[in-house]
């Protein structure tokens, strides 16, 4: 289900082409990405403000990943269950997925946040997650494309 928030209420929009679970991604009301785990292969879709379109799969299948995107042509999908939990990070450029600098700590079920006004595939935060069955973490990592490095912000 896709819904849009206008500041006071939600409006239902067009649904994803393929229903799934563990959706990661981000974007705006007019341009977004999502990656769904739970099924093989992962289903990736691009939002143009009106409808979802299927796009290519990541290079490495992962379930329960984190994600960050500022549009449907700039995003990251990171970590997740390969299985086991993994550090793999891939960037979307609007056409293809490319493996980039991986996270420092393998995890699944983490949340993602786009960093700054031009986030997506240039900066992101990976927050929390599960590092082993039943073992959760509050670890936050920052991904910055200019440095091609991962920085540990906090540990738990």
Labelled PLM ranges:
Residues 1-156:
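Polar, enzyme-active/binding microenvironments
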